[in-house]
Amino acid sequence: RFFGWERQPGKDTIQGKLEAVLGELQGAPVNVIGAGRTDAGVHARAMTANVVLDTALTPEEIRDYMNRYLPDAIAVREVKEAAPRFHARYNALGKTYRYTCHVGAVKPVFDRKYVTLLDYEPDVERMRLAAAYLLGEQDFASFCGNPRMKKSTVRMVDHIGIEQRRDRVIFTFHGTGFLQNMVRILVGTLLEVGRGYWEPEYVQEILLAKDRKRAGPTAPPEGLCLMKVDY
């Protein structure tokens, strides 16, 4: 439906739609700053953003105005007055992502845009063993989708949960921050372990290699959702 968060000329993006509506409210262009840049196909239940507005409307009235004019696929849950120096991206202390896979021959018609389809049943216990090697502050260069990344690729991941609920395998990640496509590459790698292609211990070698080619594929965007941003 949208080409990700970040505004792009001639394309529908979340940032672009928010700025268009708020620009009409303000009567002048505005700059909406998000907590991150979700890719096309990725979802968010709790994206946080900040914007400077000069208006007499209350936060509730701003929320209602936005929800009246935004596309049906975008909803503003809450508007709050922030501190003058608040920055949705740089002030974030942590993020929680969820990745959902559907296992089975019957397609999930109503949820098809929010899950990734698997034609095999991954071994959850094997994936949990592999995930244990990914916890802590480590160099995740092998799990970075940007080959020209010049900044530090060291990140802290303090929780990886993997559970099976009937026909769903659900991954939950929490960390202080994530590299481009990092969560999707982590999922793609864990699924390779879950289907028996790699042993759980091989994840250690992938980390030490600091080479994107050693990790698994980038999992499709549909199953990924930003669940929470900590401040």
Language-model segment annotations:
Residues 1-231:
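Structured-RNA-binding interfaces characteristic of tRNA pseudouridine synthases
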